[in-house]
Regions:
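Condensing-enzyme catalytic core mediating Claisen C-C bond formation in acyl metabolism
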Residues: 59, 318-358
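Stable alpha-helical structural segments in soluble proteins, enriched in small hydrophobic residues
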Residues: 159-171, 270
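Short mixed-charge
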Residues: 173-197
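Active-site-proximal gating segment of KS-fold condensing enzymes and close homologs
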Residues: 151-157, 202-258, 298-318
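Short conserved active-site loop signatures built around small residues
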Residues: 267
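Short acidic, glycine/serine/threonine-rich loops at helix termini
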Residues: 70-73, 215-219, 271-272, 296-304, ...
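ACP-dependent fatty acid/polyketide chain-elongation machinery
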Residues: 1-149, 347-358
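Acyl-CoA/ACP chain-elongation machinery
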Residues: 282-331
């Protein structure tokens, strides 16, 4: 075996690792090549190649954010509210506190000395009390999306749609009318899309964790409680979390397209993947959209219970004692919700539109 490392001068890239003293397989010793008989050798210059096909500066030319604790998720003052350090954490309603308590949770708790024990949750004081909860948001009213499209999306994907459209606007990337020519020769508007020159060079990455679960919960509850329940034919579209594909379809983006889920690092990793795409020449621009809403009523009852059971969620009711990141007094995570949109692209593309990147 050989250890490969960055840099041609790295001795680790050229030094063989000593084989184990005893064979690691069931084969006879004669069949296990030793250091003299082994035919494996690294190719000359076998090191990590960091030469990119497309050099140059990568910038963020547009961004948007939707945050909790506001009257409107994508209000005009969201950025200023963040800069001002305003508190956007609210108390969870009593019904949700009790619903979590009713789950018969056994919580993992760690003591100051590092020991851990499982503690049954019996008292409301032990439940979840704080969360970042979203305000008003309507994809149709605020962004002009047709109800047909909105109703085929779960809540998180709707938020991602809004964030993506706001980010494009912030990056000064227009959406122009799309037309269909009728048999009589007339042109009929069929929607809005990126300019033709941008469609093939724009990719989409959707970063999210809990897509579609809210829809599944609502449908399961309706099926169990409503005697007149009828199955929603849009169910599959809503639960599979295809916000990236639907967003690309809506804006006419034909570049690479994917969705990732690596928990709290999802958007961060999406930015890294976007840079890789740009450096490799896969596209010239990537719209990164990220969203989650685990604090709405149906989701909070279950996701909050999950965080509480693992000992990761705080059960503190005083926000001044709960919101203590990187502090020895911290006692758990405060669940939240929100959305983000980022336009990552080659610097010259932003410069050509007269955009000063962030």
């Amino acid at each position: 075996e050989y250890v490969l490392a960055r840099g041609e001068g790295s001795p680790a890239a050229q030094t063989p690792v000593e084989p184990p003293a005893t064979p690691v397989s069931a084969k006879s010793e004669a069949s296990v090549p030793g250091p003299e008989t082994s035919t494996f050798a690294p190719a000359e210059g076998d090191v990590l190649d960091t030469t990119w096909a497309v050099p140059g500066e990568i910038v963020c030319s547009g961004m948007s954010v939707g945050i909790p604790g506001q009257e409107m998720v994508f209000g005009d003052d969201v950025h200023q509210a963040i800069f001002d350090g305003k508190n956007h954490i609210d108390r969870v309603v009593d019904e949700t506190v009790q619903a979590i308590l009713n789950k018969n949770i056994t919580r993992l708790e760690k003591g100051p000395d590092g020991t851990a024990q499982y503690v049954p949750i019996k008292d409301p004081a032990q439940s979840v009390h704080l969360a970042g909860q979203l305000g008003s948001f309507d994809l149709c009213e605020e962004f002009g999306i047709e109800e047909r499209l909105r109703d085929g999306l779960d809540r998180a994907s709707q938020l991602a749609f809004g964030a993506g459209l706001d980010a494009l606007r912030n990056a000064r990337i227009p959406l122009v009318p799309r037309y269909r020519t009728t048999r009589s020769g007339k042109k009929v508007t069929t929607g809005w899309a990126l300019p033709d020159s941008m469609r093939d060079e724009t990719g989409i990455i959707y970063a999210a964790c809990f897509t579609g679960i809210d829809v599944a919960m609502k449908q399961a509850r309706a099926a169990a409680t409503d005697p007149n329940y009828t199955f929603d034919p849009r169910f599959l579209l809503q639960v599979i979390g295809m916000g990236h594909a639907r967003f690309a379809e809506f804006i006419g983006a034909r570049g690479p397209n994917t969705r990732i889920n690596v928990a709290c690092a999802s958007t961060t990793q999406a930015i890294g993947i976007a840079e890789d795409w740009l450096r490799l020449g896969r596209c010239k621009r990537v719209v990164v959209i990220g969203s989650d809403d685990v604090t709405e009523a149906d989701m909070m009852e279950w996701v909050g219970s999950g965080f509480l059971a693992t000992g990761a969620g705080t059960n503190e009711s005083d926000v001044t004692k709960a919101a203590l990141p990187f502090d020895k007094r911290r006692n758990g995570t405060i669940l939240g919700a929100g959305a983000v949109g980022l336009v990552i692209e080659n610097a010259e593309k932003a410069e050509n539109r007269g955009v000063v990147p962030y």
